[in-house]
Amino acid sequence: MFLQRCMSFLQCIFAAVLAWIGVRGQQVHGASQFSSTGKVNPATIKVVNNVISQASATPSSVNYHFTRQCNYKCGFCFHTAKTSFVLPIEEAKRGLQLLKESGLEKINFSGGEPFIHDRGDFLGKLVQYCKHDLQLPSVSIVSNGSMIREKWFQTYGEYLDILAISCDSFDEDTNQTIGRAQGRKSHLDNLFKVRDWCRKYKVAFKINSVINTFNVDEDMRENITELNPVRWKVFQCLLIDGENAGENSLREAERFLISDQQFQDFLERHSSISCLVPESNQKMRDSYLILDEYMRFLDCREGRKDPSKSILDVGVEEAIQFSGFDEKMFLKRGGKYVWSKADMRLEW
């Protein structure tokens, strides 16, 4: 009981300080921080608990979207080309070093299209740095696959654990409708070619699919079985204000949305695929640590991307407090798995 009172007292003090200085606008606007009895408003305590949880989070797995540029125009994209900024490589390395010192185990490079900048050489140098210099257990990439060349694997493949290729349909016309294409080039030809290179250069191959209006009734079992990825990540199409929804967005993803029941039906139809890893909207919103091109954590809990200050300016410990990251949900969705190719025991 004494300990509970101490904790309650500390919460009150902390809440009072937050009420005075403000928590980046996270206070409950229009509501008093204290009730008429002098007790802290429950909504304020919730804010405090969220901040405490985020402050104690370890950035074991981080998604670094170092570029927003892309050669595809997927209609539901939630990280669109609002800027062309890319950090100088030495600054990016400094940020990655800060993350490693804070507990980073897995880095995932994404975009935009990560191979678009400097024809993949910038990406390759970061991959090499993370595996060789930082000795991270897992280094991975998410790409649309269209700009990858075998020469890249020859130079950097040994440093990469997992390569995920985004593929939403095994029908070329559907890919064209979605925007998962460049001109009339075959997205599927690239998919199979990259899969073969992954086998040749000993990189674990993964597939990411966004389930939406145009592919929700598709049966992908035969194709996924043939490709045989180590993981098939299946996402429910998600709206993010300012990215693919709202007046300032570069995409209008509303027409791609499906219901929770439609998503569940798709999962049940593909339940025989053992490598399937489903992610609903609920799981996605707060279970990822996302760094943008300025190395700011992005808080997506309110259906938009609220950035922290850059870890390059304030450090990881301070910036992560405004990430919206729920470590429990991260673990619940299976965010921690066998992510080093050295531990996968794959037959190449």
From Swiss-Prot:
Tissue: Expressed at low levels in spleen and head kidney.
Cited Gene3D superfamilies: Aldolase class I
Gene Ontology BP annotations: defense response to virus; innate immune response; positive regulation of immune response
Up-regulation conditions: By interferon type I, type II and LPS. Induced by infection with viral hemorrhagic septicemia virus (VHSV), presumably through type I interferon pathway.
Subcellular location: Endoplasmic reticulum membrane
GO MF annotation: an example: metal ion binding
Entry keyword set: 4Fe-4S, Antiviral defense, Endoplasmic reticulum, Immunity, Innate immunity, Iron, Iron-sulfur, Membrane, Metal-binding, S-adenosyl-L-methionine
Chief subcellular location: endoplasmic reticulum
Membrane topology (UniProt): Peripheral membrane protein
Cofactors (names): [4Fe-4S] cluster
Cofactor note: Binds 1 [4Fe-4S] cluster. The cluster is coordinated with 3 cysteines and an exchangeable S-adenosyl-L-methionine.
Domain of life of the source: Eukaryota
Domain Radical SAM core: 56-276
Residues annotated as binding [4Fe-4S] cluster: 70, 74, 77
Gene Ontology terms: cellular component: endoplasmic reticulum membrane; lipid droplet; mitochondrion
InterPro entries named in the record: Aldolase_TIM (IPR013785), Elp3/MiaA/NifB-like_rSAM (IPR006638), RSAD2 (IPR026372), RSAD2/Viperin_antiviral (IPR051196), rSAM (IPR007197)
Family: Belongs to the radical SAM superfamily. RSAD2 family.
Function: Interferon-inducible iron-sulfur (4FE-4S) cluster-binding antiviral protein which plays a major role in the cell antiviral state induced by type I and type II interferon.
Protein name as catalogued: S-adenosylmethionine-dependent nucleotide dehydratase RSAD2
UniProt source species: Oncorhynchus mykiss (Rainbow trout)
Organism lineage string: Eukaryota, Metazoa, Chordata, Craniata, Vertebrata
Gene (name only): rsad2
